């Protein structure tokens, strides 16, 4: 059976089109071994977590077998929030979080997006979890990755250089790990 990936886009006007390049790159790198499902999330310009949560749940339910979840930027933080609040309808074979904002950091205080107090324990049944971030990310500060690393030592941290917020539209490192799952 093919591996099935659910890729959740970032937020903001034009994010779906921008992240489509990431999803397409990942599909090209993985070839016929995987299917990358890339749904357009509701109201990308003014994201509401509840609407995205419902869409994530619906898309996750149509996957066959184990799911691999990937989120970019706001999509990464919404994947994390979803997994801390809900029991996924499918077994999760891996989680890949790209340029995830740490909600609650200075100038990033959005209560609706923040994780609960005991969010780390929610991931005890889900492994592996990878966090990727480029040191030169111009949207989400690299310090957000450091905050996750401090609070979430079980996560596998991948620090990249010169890739920016969109990873130069190249997810080679992510694809290499997915091939091993």
Each language-model region and where it sits:
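Gly/Ala-rich beta-loop-alpha elbow adjacent to hydrolase catalytic centers
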Residues: 70-79
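Short beta-strand/loop motif that positions the catalytic acidic residue
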Residues: 125, 130-133, 137
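Conserved alpha/beta-hydrolase fold motif
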Residues: 69-70, 95
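Catalytic active-site module of serine/aspartate enzymes centered on a nucleophile-bearing elbow/loop
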Residues: 59-63, 170-181
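Conserved alpha/beta-hydrolase "acid-adjacent" motif
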Residues: 138-144
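Catalytic histidine-centered segment of alpha/beta-hydrolase-like enzymes
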Residues: 47-49, 163-175
């Amino acid at each position: 059976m093919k591996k099935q990936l659910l890729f959740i886009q970032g937020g903001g006007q034009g994010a779906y089109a921008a992240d489509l390049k990431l999803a397409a790159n990942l599909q090209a790198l993985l070839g016929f071994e995987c299917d990358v499902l890339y749904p357009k999330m509701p109201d990308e310009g003014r994201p509401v977590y509840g609407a995205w949560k419902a869409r994530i749940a619906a898309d996750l339910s149509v996957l066959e077998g184990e799911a691999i979840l990937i989120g970019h930027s706001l999509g990464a933080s919404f994947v994390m929030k979803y997994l801390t609040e809900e029991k996924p309808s499918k077994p999760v074979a891996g989680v890949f979080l790209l340029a995830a904002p740490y909600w609650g950091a200075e100038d990033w205080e959005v209560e609706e997006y923040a994780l609960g107090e005991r969010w780390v324990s929610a991931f005890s049944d889900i492994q592996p979890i990878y966090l990727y971030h480029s040191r030169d990310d111009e949207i989400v500060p690299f310090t957000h990755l450091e905050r996750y690393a401090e609070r979430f030592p079980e996560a596998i941290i991948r620090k990249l250089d010169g890739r920016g917020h969109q990873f130069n539209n190249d997810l080679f490192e992510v694809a290499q790990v997915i091939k091993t799952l």
